[in-house]
Amino acid sequence: MLKMDLQFFASKKGVGSTKNGRDSHSKRLGAKRADGQAVTGGSILVRQRGTRVYPGENVGKGGDDTLFAKIDGVVKYERVGRDRKKVSVYPA
């Protein structure tokens, strides 16, 4: 009698895992109040990483570099020197 040696191979190859496939949530950074806009004290003016915009008159800087109004007033963005910006709040 004939003896046959049958071997079956996988019809689908095993698929390895990928190192991609995830993404972080956006941090919603940027200016939150426009130039000339009226704000109340405590309003967030700019959310940023590092000091892209510097605090000016009546503006505070939080621990995560967020700029906020210290008083009620009107927002004013100003240029300081060639490559620096600051934001101030002046009483209305």
From Swiss-Prot:
One of its GO terms (cellular component) is cytosolic large ribosomal subunit. It comes from the Bacteria. Coiled coil: none annotated. One of its GO terms (molecular function) is structural constituent of ribosome. Residues 1-9 form a propeptide. The N-terminus is cleaved by ribosomal processing cysteine protease Prp. NCBIfam families: L27. Belongs to the bacterial ribosomal protein bL27 family. This is Large ribosomal subunit protein bL27.
